[in-house]
Amino acid sequence: EAEQQYKIFVLKYFDERKQETLIAGDMFEMEWKEQIDTSIPTLFIVSGVFQYFYEDKIIEFIKKLKKEFPYGELIFDTARKKSGLRFANWFIKRTGNPEALMHFYIEDSADFSKKTDTTLVEELTFFKDARELLRKKLNFITKLFMKIADYKRQALIIHLKW
């Protein structure tokens, strides 16, 4: 019942495209994999999720993905260094949402890929494209914070494969 309601909610905001599958469920439990052909190459995009869990849980999840999907790639966003996480949590507290604090960050992407037995394909700064696309729509302070975060590499997009 809850799974069906979630799927209806998701489909209200996201269109399911050809060769895309939107699945409701606990990502750590892996029952959702039954809805996907695990024998073909699969790209997982996990956006705005990992930060809310601890590193050991994320590493365990990636290892499960590797076991269930032999030809996989994973793209996700993360804070880099504890300072990036401190900044994000400071900002979250200011918005009045102290229950949504972030825990996961990566000090070194190459080291993290070794911990997960994956290959680091790419590491990108998080806001570069957004700053260019939205430059006329953002206020000065937002642009400044985004630029500082990119300059200090505090927020990243990581691409791993196995």
Regions found by a protein language model. Give the residues of each.
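Alpha-helical subdomain
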Residues: 1-162
